[in-house]
Regions:
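Active-site PLP attachment segment
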Residues: 166-204, 227
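PLP-dependent aminotransferase-like
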Residues: 56-126, 130-142, 146-151, 158
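PLP-dependent aminotransferase class I/II
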Residues: 23-30, 35-39, 102-106, 110-116, ...
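N-terminal "arm"/small-domain region of PLP-dependent enzymes with the aminotransferase-like
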Residues: 1-18, 347
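Conserved G/P- and acidic residue-centered "switch" motifs that form tight phosphate/ATP-binding loops
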Residues: 47, 84, 150, 179, ...
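Conserved active-site segment immediately N-terminal to the catalytic lysine
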Residues: 149-183, 212-217
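Structural detector of well-ordered beta-strand residues that form the stable sheet scaffold
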Residues: 42, 67, 88, 146-148, ...
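Phosphate-binding glycine-rich loop
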Residues: 18-65, 79-81, 89, 113, ...
Length: 369
């Protein structure tokens, strides 16, 4: 916690505004939207809810196709199923680990030949690094398909000076407990489409029509953020830049420590932007004698948590029957599978002390001796 969260939460209690509306909800929506440079936003129960509402806002219905990054967490694509849509997974590129414009173009051409188009493209900004949005936007504009930018992991990151999450028709952020700022649970949908956000607020409060009695002409959802949770978010937003600076320091410390180990490659930091360094990830060379599981188990033995990189959606048991477009059809495995096979997420908590990080580094270095 940054310190001011208690002030905003106390205000909610003192004024007896603890429902999913109030000064903190309004304030959090306004302050975060202004921070990222978007016209408006809707504070919601989760990032997943935000993706769901974005899909509904762009008109996804039963049977509609939605292109989505494969190398991501399941919350990026589960809402497609909620609306009866059909996900089509898109591979990554090595340069950013994010959606491959090459694979995206392949998917569009294939669907053009079929005589149909996806209803939307969900672009995920993995581990705080923005996708190459100029290339992706150019492709999506060519086929007149809206972008939903999943910036759950990349709040505060920029692409060519513009904030991650503000490039599509809608952008989403997550404030889950593990994100760069947290409300314990929550999300935000941002857009320059003020009418669309107003509709999302309506759907998210059970789609109650304006009437003296309870009247409903549309299906609604219990997706709005509470005034208490929003108060935590307002306090957290005030320390976001400090968090990003600390995350970058953690990344740079790992980078310096591992620079002599040829088999360790740090996560990409693309010249086109600045990530928020949410998680520091590494990939090991194909010929490395040390494998990702060796690192995970060695740290686990010392009660230190690390994790594999996200398992791509197109090889997940639930989603393996859905279509997938690869970056390079000539390779035996996709780029996203390759990153998964060779990748590790290292401890990156902003509360981690220098001594604790040095302990992590010492354990990993010891495996390569």
């Amino acid at each position: 916690m940054g310190g001011l969260e208690e002030v905003f939460v106390k205000e909610a209690f003192d004024t007896n505004w603890i429902a999913p509306l109030g000064a903190n909800v309004d304030g959090f929506e306004k302050e975060l939207s202004e921070y990222v440079g978007s016209k408006t936003g809707a504070a919601l129960a989760s990032g997943t809810a935000a993706i769901h509402m974005a899909l509904k806002a762009v008109g996804v219905k039963k049977g509609d196709k939605v292109f989505c990054s494969s190398l991501t967490f399941a919350a990026s694509c589960n809402p497609i199923i909620y609306e009866g849509g059909i996900p089509v997974f898109i591979d990554s590129e090595l340069e950013s680990h994010n959606m491959s414009p090459v694979a995206l173009e392949k998917a569009f051409k294939a669907y053009e030949e079929k005589g149909e188009m996806p209803k939307a493209v969900i672009v995920v900004n993995l581990y705080g690094q923005s996708a190459d949005m100029d290339k992706i936007i150019k492709i999506c504009k060519k086929y007149n398909v809206p972008i939903i930018e999943d910036a759950a992991e990349s709040l505060g990151a920029t692409y060519k000076g513009k904030h991650s999450g503000t490039f599509g028709e809608y952008g989403i952020y997550s404030f889950n407990g593990n994100k760069i700022i947290t409300t314990s649970g929550g999300g935000m949908l941002v857009s320059n489409n003020e009418e669309g956000i107003a509709k999302v607020r309506f759907w998210s409060t059970q789609a109650r029509d304006k009437a003296r009695h309870y009247e409903h002409t549309e299906l609604g959802y219990n997706y709005r953020m509470s005034n208490i949770v929003a108060g935590i978010g307002r306090g957290q937003l005030r320390v976001l830049e400090d968090r990003i600076a600390k995350k970058k320091e953690i990344f740079e410390t790992y980078k310096e420590a591992f620079k002599e180990i040829e088999d360790i490659e740090m996560m990409p930091v693309c010249e086109y932007g600045e990530p928020n360094y949410w998680l520091t990830t590494i990939t090991l060379s194909e010929n490395s004698k040390v494998k990702p599981l060796d690192i995970i188990l060695a740290l686990e033995k010392e009660n230190i948590e690390s994790r594999p990189i996200w398992k791509p959606m197109h090889i997940q048991p639930y989603y393996k029957e859905y279509e997938f477009y690869s970056h390079n059809d000539e390779e035996e495995i996709s780029i996203s599978e390759d990153i998964f096979n060779r990748g590790v997420c290292l401890p990156s908590d902003t509360k981690m002390t220098k001594e604790e990080q040095e302990r992590v580094i010492k354990i990993i270095k010891g495996l390569f001796k």
